[in-house]
Amino acid sequence: MKIIHIANFYGPKSGGIKTTLHNLGSGYTNRGHDFTYIVPGVGFYQEKTPHGNRITVPSWLIPFSGGYRIIRSNRQIKSILLALSPDRIEISDRFTLSGVGRWARSHKIPTLVFSHETLRGLIKTYQPFSLSKFVRWHNARLAASFDHVVTTTNFAAAEFREIGIDNLMQIPLGVDLATFSPKNRDEELRTKLLKNGDVLRVHCGRLSPEKKPERSIEALRE
């Protein structure tokens, strides 16, 4: 099967989106599928990667975002899709790429969209007020544009369940049990990091507003 995944906000400094794409690609290719992912960049080029074929297309740099980019032309994306004739299309973006879902439906190509976050949470990060009606309208429109909406947590799924959509799929994230295992506990490293303290707390995450890294400190204070 030929699968194409299109994503915004993919780049050298991105975390979750890049990890998702690379793991999806590795999983698909290991099972014999042809996987291509289309991502934003500074120009147009194509390359082979361990995770599949990567096509980079021209994009806009989002000001004050720390380097995030969004794909510039949906028309170019549709031309690429016509040339590659995918069996399935996946999208990781809830804003500028929903039109690709409607286009794919007109070409009888099955689709899904990943909702990696909550729109309500994104708005609260950058705006001091609630836009509940907009959130409900946007999520209903997004769900209607694709055959399936995929979330990984109850938290991300909640705002879709609130509006009663019938094409929601919740697929929990997997865990790399070889890497994240008690067998890897290192008492020497723990002692070194504690520096004669009583509690060692490790925060693994990007220092960006939407990740709310301050919560680790707040939880410890409580």
Segments predicted by a language model, with ranges:
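N-terminal subdomain of nucleotide-sugar transferases
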Residues: 1-56, 221
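Conserved donor-binding/catalytic core segment of Leloir-type glycosyltransferases
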Residues: 4, 194-221
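Carbohydrate-associated surface elements
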Residues: 41, 155, 174
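A short, charged, and often flexible helix/loop element on the N-terminal side
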Residues: 52-79, 127, 131
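An aromatic- and histidine-rich active-site surface loop
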Residues: 88-120
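Membrane-proximal helix-turn-helix segments that form the acceptor-binding/catalytic region
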Residues: 106, 132-148, 163
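Short beta-strand->alpha-helix junction loop in the catalytic core
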Residues: 172-181
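A short helix/loop element that forms part of the nucleotide-sugar donor recognition site in Leloir-type
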Residues: 181-195
